């Protein structure tokens, strides 16, 4: 089976409205990943929306963002598709299903994702669906953020009450049906970081309503209370990311990366003493005093 000039080889994954396949591009002589969407997206207003959002993704260029090579609609089957960089590795979702990861590793991975988000935010793009399934860890331990399919140009975003994405990673403003911005991605990445550090979800519930209620009103245990190897200052960073009020949340993904990278450079035994620089401590303290 072919899609355009691309030769389909195997299915890599399947979602609710799409599937990802491994393919070969004979023109460039390289492997690629192709995301195939439902034909419904190729009709009417949805077609224009698909093409518009694909162009949004195509604007992004960052080492930790999966590169978009091509896009189109296979007219014979009316199948929209995105041709992307083929990443050899596994989703973070599969890794944390086995439990927590060392906090220096968790901080490194989260910091790289935060830098990728910062690059997107500087281009007026929010991801809108940051979760472990959309974070790939390569075979050489690099991080790749994928699936900007839910992203929006912030310059065009108004109040939208529709709930897309995965409930466990929703931010409070999304549940309330309010406009989202870059701080919404920070909250979702904070949830991912919490899961990496502790091996559990901060807002777990036995129903959609319970999850939403927990996101809106409960305060999860501090990570160090779940995993004693985690230093207290890292607790503070996670708390700042998960602040329910966007005005008091960790202000930018760039700031989040700056706060996390020092932990990533230290071994666990040294990390609690690593973040003692006055300017670093004062930045976190200011965030927490306002939370």
Named regions from a protein language model:
Residues 115-125:
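Protein kinase catalytic-loop region centered on the HRD/HxD motif
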């Amino acid at each position: 089976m072919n899609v355009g000039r691309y030769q389909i080889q195997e299915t890599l994954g399947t979602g609710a409205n799409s599937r990802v396949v491994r393919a070969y591009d004979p023109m460039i002589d390289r492997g690629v990943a192709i995301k195939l969407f439902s034909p419904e997206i190729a009709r009417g207003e949805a077609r224009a929306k698909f093409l518009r959002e694909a162009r949004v993704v195509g604007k992004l260029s960052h080492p930790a963002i999966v590169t978009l090579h091509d896009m189109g609609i296979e007219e014979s089957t009316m199948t929209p598709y995105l041709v992307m960089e083929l990443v050899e590795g596994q989703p973070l979702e599969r890794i944390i299903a086995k439990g927590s990861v060392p906090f220096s590793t968790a901080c490194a991975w989260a910091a790289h994702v935060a830098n990728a988000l910062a690059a997107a935010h500087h281009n007026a793009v929010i991801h809108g669906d940051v979760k472990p399934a959309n974070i790939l860890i390569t075979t050489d331990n690099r991080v790749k953020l994928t699936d900007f399919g839910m992203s929006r140009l912030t310059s065009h975003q108004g109040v939208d009450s529709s709930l897309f994405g995965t409930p466990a990673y929703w931010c409070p403003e999304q549940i309330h049906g309010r406009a989202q911005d870059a701080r919404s991605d920070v909250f979702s990445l904070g949830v991912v970081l919490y899961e990496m550090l502790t091996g559990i979800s901060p807002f777990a519930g036995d129903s959609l309503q319970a999850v939403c209620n927990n996101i809106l009103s409960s305060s999860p245990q501090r990570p160090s209370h779940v995993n004693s190897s985690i230093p207290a200052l890292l607790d503070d960073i996670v708390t700042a990311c998960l602040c329910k009020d966007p005005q008091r949340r960790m202000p930018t993904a760039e700031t989040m990366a700056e706060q996390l990278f020092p932990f990533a450079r230290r071994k666990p035994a040294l990390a609690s003493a690593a973040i003692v620089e006055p300017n670093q401590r004062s930045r976190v303290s200011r965030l927490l005093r306002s939370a």
